Design a protein with these regions (language model features):
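Amphipathic alpha-helical packing elements
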Residues: 37-81
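An exposed acidic His-Trp-rich patch
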Residues: 74-106
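Alpha-helical structural motif
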Residues: 18-21, 59, 73, 92
Length: 147
């Protein structure tokens, strides 16, 4: 088994605060801090990670520093978010969640993920980023751990 891990918490998952993708962001930064994030994954990328930080009004480096220094459990991380988020209203959370759930990858990204997974790019194929990222994670997990 690998000494690094593919993050398997979906971007579609929310913790008690109700913010989708936040548990995945915590997992990826935590794994990177421990030197255990699979090399093909950024701890904080320009997609859902950046969207989530921006929606909450959190600074990337402050989040990284907190996780590095404190190695928090997920509820401890959410407590930090609750304390420091600049926009944590129900409306802001719902707007963010809708943006994440409604995001579609570009054609090239979709085709690449579907091809790697051996799936046809037809009318039944997922188009949304969350579903495609799940497929990509499961494929990467299979390659790294099960193959």
């Amino acid at each position: 088994m690998s000494d690094t891990y593919v993050p398997l918490i979906s971007s579609g998952v929310a913790g008690p605060l109700g913010v989708v993708h936040l548990p995945r962001l915590w997992q990826k930064v935590s794994l990177e801090t421990a030197g255990k994030l699979a090399s093909s994954y950024p701890a904080v990328g320009k997609g859902f990670d950046a969207m989530t930080l921006a929606a909450l009004g959190l600074e990337e480096q402050a989040v990284r520093n907190y996780i590095k220094q404190n190695k928090p459990t997920y509820p401890q991380f959410e407590a930090l978010v609750k304390k420091n988020a600049k926009s944590l209203t129900r409306e802001a959370i719902e707007k963010h969640n809708a943006a994440v759930r409604g995001y579609n990858h570009d054609d090239e990204t979709r085709q690449s993920i579907l091809s790697a997974c051996g799936m046809a790019d037809d009318a039944s194929a997922p188009r949304d980023g969350v579903s495609l990222n799940n497929l990509d994670d499961w494929y990467e997990f299979h390659q790294a751990v099960l193959k």
